Amino acid sequence: MDQASTPRPRSTGVLLHPTALPGSPVCGSFGEPSRRWLRLLADHNIGVWQMLPLAPPDPTGSPYSSPSCFALNPWFLDAADLAAEQFISAEQLDGLPGAEAPSHGVDSLSFAQACERSAALSEALLQSWPDQSAERQQAFAQWCSEQTWLEDHVRFRVLHDQHQQAWWTWPQPLAQHQSAALERWARDHQDALQKERLTQWQLDRQWQQIRTLAADLGILLFGDLPFYVSADSADVWSHRSLFTIAADGRLSTQSGVPPDYFSETGQLWGSPVYRWWRHRLTRFSWWRKRIARQRQLMDLLRLDHFRALAMFWAVPGGDTTAEHGQWQPSPGASLLRKLRSDAGGALPLIAEDLGVITPDVEALRDGFALPGMKVLQFAFDGQSDNPYLPENIDGSRWVVYTGTHDNATTLGWWQ
């Protein structure tokens, strides 16, 4: 079907989300904690840093059900770096929530404290912005003009904070993303919108500095892309026609996986699925922009639930279990061809192909020369033909893990 990509050299990596890095109040950041971590990896000849999605989390703290496929999590903004560059003052830095707390060294993260600190830091950025140089203001304006996703994100964020409910419950002209109504509303919320823009710009600036350091140290940054999108997100709100969701938030079809050995009722994820025929009409424009944004942030990208690019399990919208869904085809090959063309060569994607994988999924993965995944914790069931045993792993196009974020730690597994 397609030419194989150039084999990647063998390397070793570590999977660790930036929230887990020590050295900042509340949680890890895109500042010195990430720089120190990269230097530690380089000192030990570790060439890949893999992480979970960097997107804003949902209310439970999960980045896999984010309110934005394009934005970055404000928790990661490093206040000390902003103060050192005089984007905020030393007094503002000292006054941030959590500033008096000891450096992150506990085994849990307070989501409420992380949100409180990031909100206060965003406010400090806004208050200090009029004092910034013309050069900085111009750089900010230029960046904003290049981010086609930004205005939908900042409007969604401010509206969500204002109404504290899902978008389909907002006043109808706003809920239906009507341009004239949004423009009128935006005129009364300029400061709040500007605060969100500044936050995303600074996050992007700090992460690009991390990218530069990683490249200088010879370390690849390896991100993670959830397949489906939260119903209550800027993406679905602003592109509702691309998803199986009605104006009142009801899903005509929802995502999940069918019953199997582990679950008699399957898994019901509850997010809308894609109206693939509409994506085809746009030549997959939204998907291509989504991947292009991730390529600005990462060198490699794991595509979660890769099997849904071949066939996906579609569950009726009103169902409470995944039992009565049906398999439906996806235009995965067409999408991957577009993405490969955009990339100008080999796709920087890793297929998450764990679980029950059928020949059509394997053919799609192999046809585009995408590496798959192997997990060593799955290997030792006493069966000599177990596909996860190292001696049974054929070829070199695999990412092999001891375990992933879905598994126990290796120590916990062993015990």
Where are the model-predicted features located?
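Alpha-amylase-like alpha-glycosidases and glucanotransferases acting on alpha-linked glucans and related
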Residues: 4-10, 15-17, 23-26, 60-204, ...
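Catalytic domains of carbohydrate-active enzymes, especially glycoside hydrolases
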Residues: 32-57, 293-300
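Outer-envelope exported proteins of Gram-negative bacteria
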Residues: 52, 220-222, 226, 300, ...
